């Protein structure tokens, strides 16, 4: 009886899971060649995938959840997916170069999703890009609501101006990353002080910063640098994104599961420097911490001890390490100042030698990872080709040896035949020319074997 109940419960769970999958898939449309003509009437969030792609298969259940969520909240954005290998011409038209590629298509515009492939991040991307490029903030209440909702956002304050045109151009390029708003001076909170109008501000880290054209340069570049919070929990994707900012990244490499004083102290030091020395370093540095050293070891092609502090230049793959332990904030500030004035020598880089080293390191890492994960598979992948190559080399070597031996035997045989012919010709010349005369025979010279017999 108990076994029957367990079996019934298992069947019920399986049925629920299957129904959930069917329901989720029902809100994601499979797109074909007709999509090209019919898409302009709606806003589409599309996953361009390949059936053989492993990352695409991992994304599939997340994508089904995105479709269900967008439908349940009444979003005007339709969710679909397209096999880019079957409809390669359409995929090429939208600039698909890898799999999976997530794009939001709005009219003639196509926006790439470049963030993490989680349900929340994809939905946030769809909401941000599908709406207005510049969203108005008509009241202080709305302004305060946006501050609570978004960790980082930009605001243009003022009327029509050349600065606003630059702001719109920057927003059209960077809307895939962050939010852009506009407001009047009356709507801005009282704690905000503006020296001149119009102005562009970024609100983040519980404060604000004003764009200065003379100090900050190009507006788009400034927005691209300031779209990150000053302190971040880093991963490989964020480090890649920070490469476009031109900033150095000061990282505390720690083990978050380790609660020892040494690990928590380094993290606190980086946080304190990011907070208290922002005015000095925020133009040149991004601060954060990373859990574990696996990614950093791959990036640096070296084994870093944990915990430690490393400063990365993600634009050219250089890095800076201190030859002594950082014990307090003053040590970290001194380390940063030494980097800025060139006292600390950079390591790594993207020179030809480093690129060759990278190729060797990547090949070694791949081989080691294969043997660690599956020794039998590693033996098969690398042992079989080596065995085939060894057999081929042996065959070529033995073929050359046999050929030389046969050629040598042929020359010896040819020489023996010529000698035999000469002996026979000599005998014919020594035979008597007439039948009755007796001619004394001349003894032929003996060869070596005959002499030995005598």
Curated annotation (Swiss-Prot):
Q: What is its EC number?
A: 5.3.4.1
Q: Which UniProt keywords apply?
A: Disulfide bond, Endoplasmic reticulum, Glycoprotein, Isomerase, Membrane, Redox-active center, Signal, Transmembrane, Transmembrane helix
Query: PROSITE patterns, per this entry?
Result: THIOREDOXIN_1, THIOREDOXIN_2
- Thioredoxin domain: from which residue to which, for each copy? 25-128
Query: GO CC terms on record?
Result: cell surface; endoplasmic reticulum membrane
Q: Which InterPro entries match?
A: PDI_TMX3 (IPR052250), Thioredoxin-like_sf (IPR036249), Thioredoxin_CS (IPR017937), Thioredoxin_domain (IPR013766)
Q: Which cysteines are joined by disulfide bonds?
A: 53-56
Q: Does the keyword Transmembrane apply?
A: yes
Q: Which residues form the active site?
A: 53 (nucleophile), 56 (nucleophile)
The chemistry this enzyme catalyses reads:
Catalyzes the rearrangement of -S-S- bonds in proteins
User: What are the transmembrane regions?
Assistant: 376-396
Region annotated Disordered, chain positions:
412-454
Lumenal topological domain residue ranges:
25-375
The record's subcellular location field reads: Endoplasmic reticulum membrane
One short Pfam name that applies is: Thioredoxin
Chief subcellular location equals: endoplasmic reticulum
UniProt domain comment: The di-lysine motif confers endoplasmic reticulum localization for type I membrane proteins.
Concerning PANTHER family, the annotation shows: PROTEIN DISULFIDE-ISOMERASE TMX3 (PTHR46426:SF1)
- What's its job? Probable disulfide isomerase, which participates in the folding of proteins containing disulfide bonds. May act as a dithiol oxidase. Acts as a regulator of endoplasmic reticulum-mitochondria contact sites via its ability to regulate redox signals.
From the Swiss-Prot or TrEMBL record, give the protein name.
Protein disulfide-isomerase TMX3
